[in-house]
Structure formats: structure tokens, C-alpha cells
């Protein structure tokens, strides 16, 4: 058999495209060099064994897509066609994803800890998480965060507007539990339940009553009672949930009602508001929230989905194009238990308790995953993922991602800037494709994807390396 045909048969079309790309890119900054050591960004102070031991595990950050602003973290301006590692973490085996997980219902509370005299070696779990904005990215680890990418507007929070091309520790905020990155700004939640924002303030998404930039993280003085437990943001608006389930929103509203605050313009209504206001029209407590381009979604603790805002592309999934500021449940999901939601620019995803993914809204870039570019009026299960149990979903502006219980990553939608991580795809990829990872000759074994974050034209994922 001809060598080319044999390679295609053995590795598949996408893997062959990847092999061919690597073979022709030896002099490209995006080409893979297995002799280049991935920098160790962080090591647990309690880790005493090697990465292949029982007490430690290697977790890597990989990125792909457009990187002209440094958002890929590799140190240079580059575009990557496939996932490539740019940082490693040596974590205790007890590490977990940082809570709250974006758009996800909170897990059941853990059992109470043993008294110290019964469990003298007990330690607080190390938490790790990632987020992508328009042209910047972040890693959250053990209460600290590293951030990189475009610096315009002060979105990196270093006190200036310079870009960063490698993950850089931000010393201006600690005890961080969750970070959400927007278009030109950033939002963080700390362990005291306080919200901090920084970056471009022209849309009011910072929540500081003024529309100017903030170069450092600044506390949001909200009118809520108690702590905040969940945050979300988009290009121009932000949302926060209190521990009692009240939802507050702020930022830009161009008459579409995405803030959920009323039909007019005023301190308690729907104009672009630069201070947090309670969404009084939401009749039930909520536990998770996701901000789309011009709409908002929220989940109750029982897994019922509510949404509001723009609906010209069926973003709300109600079967018509009638949008508005008033929160309403999605009729076809009345008896479906949703555990996670994710919002794109004009489309929506929902993950059921059974591990199935539903999508609806704008489909022009293939981001709905239904093998077409048609808009979808109501939530429909993505059949290409029907045989998988999905545990995590994410949206970019016009692309989508899902992680299975086996640690496989699928992506679909807009591939114009290689943000799907699979070389050789058309610019519109209308059904999920598995993202393959190169087997580096580093002795760390296979990749298991833990989390993925998708920006407008790039993506970052966390993978555990399962040594042989």
C-alpha cells in the first residue's frame, strides 16, 4: 500500500492533516518541537513525589487558535492549528476544578471534615480553573491567578495597558475563587464572596458607577446582602448571584433587555447601568448564570432554565423571535433537569443531568452541531454526541465545546482562526469533531481533558497527563 494511503488509513483524515502540517512546519513558530521543555509554572509545596507517583499529577495548559495578542501564552505572536502545551503544573492528586464552575450548578456540599486529632494530615484541596476573554486568558490556581494576552483598557489588571505573552502572576488580588473574562474587562470572585472588576469601563460592565477604565482590580460595592457565590460576564454585561439566590446584573443594554431590569431607562430599569441592580422580575432563586452576547440565562437549583434578552436568532429557544427583559422559563425544557449552561454570541448550550447536550439559536457558523447552518428555534439534542456522556460544555462567540466523562474533547462551529484545534477543517464545521492531542515523547502518557475555555478566536484547555 502507498505510504500516504497507509498513514491516512491508520490515523484518520484529521490526524493525517495534523501529521502533514507538522512535517511542513519545522521552521514555523507553531510547529511542535518535542525537545522543547514545557515550563513548570507551579508546584505544590506539599508535593514530594515525582509526577508519576501517587501523590502528584502533572496538569498541562494547552492553547490553539489565534494568538496575535499573546492570548495563547506561548511568548510570541502566533497562530496554532492544534493544541500545544505552554505551561505545566505539578499538583497533588487531590486537586479539583475551582468552584463555582462557569454556568454549572454547585455540587452537593462535602461531608464535614474530621477533627484535627483524627486527621492530622488533612489539607485544603488545591483548586484550578481557566477562562478566556476576547483576546486574553487566565489561569486560577490555589487562590492566585495568572493572566496574559491583550492589555488594552487595563483588562490584565497590572496597572498598565501592556500586553503579556506568557502567563504572568497578578499580585494585586489574592484568595480568588472564580474569574470570568469579558471582551475588554475581567471579573473576579474572592473567598469572602466579594466581586472585583477591572479593565475598560465604557459599557458599565465594571459596576463602579462611572464609565472609565480600571487598571487594577477594584471592589464592586453592590447593594446585595450577604456573599456572592457565582459570577458571569460577556462582552458588555456582568451578572452575580448571592448565596440566597438573588441575581444582580449591570452593564450595557441596547434595548434588548439582557439585564432583566425593566422596559425603560432609569435606576431600576433597563438602560445601560453602571451599578449592580437586582433582577426583581425573576420569581425564583437561581444558582448559576451565563451571559451571552445580548441575552442572559440562569439556572435554578432544581435545574430549571430561565432566560431573557435578545431573541432575533432564537437565542431564547422559545420557538419564536419575541425577546424582552422579563425572565421566562424555556417551555420545552420544563421537565428537563439542566446542570450546566453556556452562552455564545447568538447561541446557547445546555447540559442535562444525563450527560446530553442541547443547542439552539444562531447556527450560521455550525456552532449548534446539528450538521447544518440553520438556526434552531427550540433546544434540540446534538445527535453526534448522543453516544457520549458529556460532563462539561463551553461556548465561544460562534463555536462550541464539550468534554466527555472519558476526558475527550469535542469542538464545532467557526474554524476560521483554527480555534477548533483540528487542522484541515472547513471554516464552518457543523458537527462535533474530536480534538486529538499529540503524544509528546516526555514520558507523561495520554491526555485527559479536565476543562476548556473558548474565546472569540482561541481556546485553552487543562489536561491531566496520565503516565504509563
Residue ranges and their predicted role:
Residues 40-44, 48-172, 178-180, 185-188, ...:
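WD40 beta-propeller repeat fold
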Residues 76, 123, 131, 160-163, ...:
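Conserved loop/turn at the beginning of each blade in beta-propeller domains
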